[in-house]
Each structure stands twice: as C-alpha cells, then as structure tokens.
Amino acid sequence: MTKIIIEVEVRPSEDENKVLQAIRNLFDFENLKEEKSGYTKILVAESHTLLSLQKFHRKLREERILDAARKYLTKNLIGNVITFMLNKQAAAVGKISFVDDEKESPLGPIKVTIEYKDPQALIDWLTPKTAKGVPLWENPIPSDE
C-alpha cells in the first residue's frame, strides 16, 4: 500500500493560497483537508499513488541534488516509512531544500511522510546513484500495487 502525507502549517501572517502553491510546486495530491491548531491551520495533503511524486522526481534532477537527496532520504528511512522536511519558502519558488530541524524553516517546514512496501525501490527511483553527478541508471516508477 502506498500512502503519502504532506503536512504544512499556515501561520496567521501567511496567505493560505501561497502555502498551498508551495506544496503544488513539488507534489500532486488526491485529497486536501484543513485542521485547526490554535491560531494556525494545518493543511494535510494525501495521496495513494507514487505518481504524486513525479514533480519532486523531476525537480531533484533539475536541481542536480540527487546524491544529497539520496543520503537524506536513506537517513530518514525507518521500516517502510520515509519522512523528511522541506523549507516552505524554497518550495514556494519551486526549489527543494531539505531541513533537519523545524527551526531551519522560519515559517515552519513542509513535512512529508511516504509509506511504501519497498522503500529502497522508491529511493532508487527518486534518487539513483550517480557518477560525477550523472545518474548511473533511471528506474521506472515503482508499482503502487
């Protein structure tokens, strides 16, 4: 089973549409819900297909950050779940910037959780090993089944 959850806080000073666009710049999703937490809203985008990661896949190549991203995803793999955080401001302009701590993204990070039956196959598709920055292979997108 494939499950992708993207969570992002919308602070009172932020435009919700711009925060939503930051998610859309890197990911597609099937469902979007809004949760309230005090004065803030949390947008939760969900998907059940790896096709939702195609923009992210393409951006990793455009930005030539495959090696760094591979290390980051592998480091954040526990069992069948990969979790990572992205800088919200970078995503707002269509860029990928991984963060290790929520404080690295002043308005809060975009939190991504991917549950997949074969996470190593997913990592190999998203971020293949490279030689001098060139992918050694390009695997097809893994099956959602």
Curated annotation (Swiss-Prot):
InterPro entries: PAB1135-like, Ribosomal_uL5_dom_sf
Any Pfam family: RNA_binding
Record family assignment: Belongs to the UPF0201 family.
Protein's recorded name: UPF0201 protein STK_09490
Organism: Sulfurisphaera tokodaii (strain DSM 16993 / JCM 10545 / NBRC 100140 / 7)
